[in-house]
């Protein structure tokens, strides 16, 4: 005969297994969602002046390319948006810590923690002939995430969006990291 302590131990192990199985199921769904989007992006069209759209019903990914070839591309803009009235819960601290392969580290410039909004920029930015070049990543739970590269000309006092050269491998890694993070909702 089992004692009350043994029964409680067995119940707690059963519930912890159910909780773990639920988490593992959610993790598998998130991974499958990210892999589905990445496969759509890999299929293209990898053509100059094209926009690649991919969606899994929860997330919509847009990649705007100025040019591309078999090795790399000129990325104009990357966006990840929620669909069906969903919102994204993206951790800017994770991005600041993990996305370090763009040549310039991204740092949080502004954050409204209560609203889940954040602005990250290259820090330090690249300076060249009176022009400052930097990445800008904007996070808004309702609007999604956008990554752009800008050039600010101090003499003109204006900034313009500029394409950034990336290898396909770097772009795929960036997309995989951001889609995976956005899929954790």
Question: Which positions does each model-derived feature cover?
Answer:
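Short, flexible domain-boundary/linker segments around small modular repeats
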Residues: 30-47, 103-118, 166-170, 182-183
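Short, structured motif recognition centered on aromatic/hydrophobic residues
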Residues: 60-63, 132-141, 145-147, 174-175
């Amino acid at each position: 005969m089992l004692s009350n302590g043994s029964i409680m131990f067995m119940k707690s192990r059963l519930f912890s297994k159910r909780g773990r199985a639920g988490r593992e199921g959610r993790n598998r769904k998130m991974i499958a969602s990210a892999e589905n989007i990445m496969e759509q992006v890999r299929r293209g069209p990898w053509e100059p002046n094209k926009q690649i759209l991919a969606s899994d019903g929860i997330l919509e990914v847009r990649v705007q390319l100025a040019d591309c070839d078999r090795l790399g591309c000129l990325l104009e803009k990357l966006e990840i948006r929620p669909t069906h009235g969903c919102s994204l819960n993206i951790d800017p601290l994770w991005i600041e810590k993990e996305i370090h392969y763009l040549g310039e580290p991204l740092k949080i410039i502004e954050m409204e923690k209560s609203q889940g909004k954040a602005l990250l920029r290259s820090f330090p930015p690249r300076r060249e002939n009176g022009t400052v070049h930097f990445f800008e990543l904007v996070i808004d739970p309702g609007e999604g995430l956008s990554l752009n590269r800008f050039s600010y000309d101090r003499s003109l006092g204006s900034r313009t969006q500029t394409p950034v050269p990336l290898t396909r491998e770097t772009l795929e890694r960036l997309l995989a990291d951001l889609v995976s993070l956005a899929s954790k909702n």
